[in-house]
Amino acid sequence: MITPGERRVVMNNVASLSMLQAITYLLPAIIIPYLFRVIGPEKFGLIAFAQAFVQYFIILTDYGFSISATKEISLCRDEHAKVCKAFSSVMTVKIALAFLSLLILGIIVYFIPKFRNDWLVYVLSFGAVVGNTIFPVWFFQGTEKMRYIADINIIGGIIVAVFIFLFVRGPQDYLLVPLIYSCVSLITGLWGQYIVFRRFRVSFKLQGYKNIRRQLAAGWDIFISIAAINAYTTTRVFTVGLLTNNTITGFYSIAEKIANFCQTFPLTSFSQALFPRLSKIFHRNKIKAFKIMQRLQQIAINIALICLPLIFIFAHVIVRVVCGGDYQKTVLSLRLLLISVFFISANAFRVQFLLVCGKTHIYSRIHVIMAMVGLPLIFLLIYAFSYVGAAVATVAIEAGIFTITYFTVRRLRFS
């Protein structure tokens, strides 16, 4: 069992991340209806499409450090020299990847008409990539100081909301939306860096090729997995935008935001808070860590079986409150996506355990296989059934991941 001290640390981190996730999704629940009415569904859909597009660059700059660097920091956090070396190596790679991302963005915007026509939206949205690159969320997770993540992002979210309500007054102001998000993202990223240098006394030193290569190797399997996951998550909104229009993209993206809230709060917060602690427990006692995972997974399943049917029944009410109207496209999409949320909830701790016990290659293989199946499935179903196809594809993919992971983890043996 987890000791009282370990439980207290985990629960403090759960509280911080849960508050962060609540604000992260509740603020858009206030902002989205306002933006939808003020700038209109077409511009709203364009911004959602741009956000989905730049998400690919966020994935690239994150690489796999959200897992690999978190784990490394959690294991060496009492050795200051090793922490500084890890921090410097990770930040060097992330900054280099950010410059590569900017180059790719420039090429796409210049040569592809769909992007060139609204180039300023994509350029302004790219600021979120820079902010995410420099914000050391992985460092705070590894040191189990999640309250810094929560405090910074909650304040940032409130600033975004205030600025949008003050300055976005009509369709002509739609460019201010990505500008505000990007500026605040940059500020929060710099704030996070300040805390790392000032509070943790971490120093940045240029690292040699050997250390950089080691970080790239450590994060590779995770990066491939995350890239594969986003091949069938971020790609849904992106593909809806490519194959339909900005208005339909707006309706569907709202449904995804609501479904993501149901998935993230508080499940993702709890799994993120537990990951560094469970990694340390596994290092000492493999059987104990496995039993903790099984117990937590069953709790997550029970909660999902209680909450998700209620959300399904009252989906039309939720959509009316969030969106300010009875949008049947959004209601139908949400109800379908809730089925996928169940499979995600029933698999959250189980699939994370593959990372805890160092089976990153298996974790990667599962998601790469599902990406290879899911990506063409998404395009085919969206082409045939529009936004409904995106939701149906999501259910099929998450059910497949659940099934493969369940039987894979059952076969694990620990000595």
Please provide the spans of the model-predicted regions.
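Interhelical loop/hinge segments that connect adjacent transmembrane helices in multipass membrane
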Residues: 1-10, 174-181, 187-233, 277-291, ...
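Interfacial segments at transmembrane-helix termini and the short loops linking adjacent helices
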Residues: 5-6, 109-125, 313-345
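Signature of the first transmembrane helix
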Residues: 9-66, 161, 221-247, 370, ...
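Membrane-water interface segments that mark the loop-to-transmembrane alpha-helix transition
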Residues: 12-24, 50, 55, 59-109, ...
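Helix-terminus/linker motif at the lipid-water interface of multi-pass membrane proteins
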Residues: 27-43, 166-169, 230-261, 277-280, ...
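Helix-loop junctions and terminal segments of transmembrane helices
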Residues: 62-78, 255, 259-284, 351-356
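Hydrophobic alpha-helical transmembrane segments
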Residues: 119, 126, 150-200, 256, ...
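Membrane-interface junctions at transmembrane-helix termini in multi-pass inner-membrane proteins
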Residues: 119, 129-153, 339-368
